[in-house]
Amino acid sequence: MHRSPLAWLRLLLAAVLGAFLLGGPLHAAETAATRSPAWAQAVDPSINLYRMSPTLYRSALPNAQSVALLQRLQVKTVVSFIKDDDRAWLGQAPVRVLSLPTHADRVDDAEVLSVLRQLQAAEREGPVLMHCKHGNNRTGLFAAMYRIVVQGWDKQAALEEMQHGGFGDEDDMRDASAYVRGADVDGLRLAMANGECSPSRFAVCHVREWMAQALDRP
């Protein structure tokens, strides 16, 4: 049967549209099926809120409407990596606020170890939420290093979660990814276990310790 060029064009467009409509659900199903159950689980996508463990959550900057949810989650401490005052949205909610402003493009090992220790200390008092502005770069960096140093994940597994866990575009996490890729995992774990401020003996924090000790000598 002879078909006009217009008819063939209509058939082609219908085929392309059908493939697109079918491909979307299939891709979504494939993504859901391949997402590791060990990765942080979504709680409230509107603020990029995810549950990393029973005592640790991560998110973008929350708002006043988030307070009721955080109270249901029994969050006791909010750790912020930005300069904004969390009391602006928390109000008088009975939540401890810990302000640790950082920059993912120039974070160092001493800062990472300090944050990890403060997260662990806060977790002993109850669930903790850590956040930055968008919940992917600064928060992603500390979440990945928590996975690696505290929970014992390997570097690649932590990077996979960071980049494909649904927290944002991979391009938005370039600084965090660069730090994680270059991190001295063994050195950080050893320093964490030994209570040292940095894996490097020449880090500024160690120099300060030496100077303080020297000044204390009679």
Curated annotation (Swiss-Prot):
Name by which UniProt lists this protein: Dual specificity protein phosphatase TpbA
Residues of the Tyrosine-protein phosphatase domain: 44-188
Chief location: periplasm
Pfam families associated with the record: Y_phosphatase2 (PF03162)
Database matches in PANTHER family: DUAL SPECIFICITY PROTEIN PHOSPHATASE TPBA, TYROSINE-PROTEIN PHOSPHATASE
Stated family: Belongs to the protein-tyrosine phosphatase family.
SUPFAM superfamilies tied to this protein: (Phosphotyrosine protein) phosphatases II
Protein role: Phosphatase that regulates diverse phenotypes in P.aeruginosa via regulation of the concentration of cellular c-di-GMP. Acts by dephosphorylating the membrane-anchored diguanylate cyclase TpbB at tyrosine and serine/threonine sites, leading to inactivation of TpbB and reduced c-di-GMP production. In vitro shows phosphatase activity toward p-nitrophenyl phosphate (pNPP) and tyrosine phosphopeptides.
Gene Ontology, cellular component aspect: periplasmic space
Active site: D105 (proton donor/acceptor), C132 (phosphocysteine intermediate)
Subcellular location: Periplasm
Gene3D superfamilies: Protein tyrosine phosphatase superfamily
GO molecular function annotations of the record: phosphatase activity; protein tyrosine phosphatase activity
Domain notes: Adopts a canonical dual specific tyrosine phosphatase (DUSP) fold, similar to eukaryotic DUSPs. Conformational changes occur upon ligand binding.
Broadest EC class assigned to this enzyme: hydrolase
Enzyme Commission number(s) from the entry: 3.1.3.16, 3.1.3.48
Record's keyword terms, sorted: Hydrolase, Periplasm, Protein phosphatase, Signal
Signal peptide: 1-28
Gene this chain is encoded by: tpbA
Catalytic activity: O-phospho-L-tyrosyl-[protein] + H2O = L-tyrosyl-[protein] + phosphate; O-phospho-L-threonyl-[protein] + H2O = L-threonyl-[protein] + phosphate; O-phospho-L-seryl-[protein] + H2O = L-seryl-[protein] + phosphate
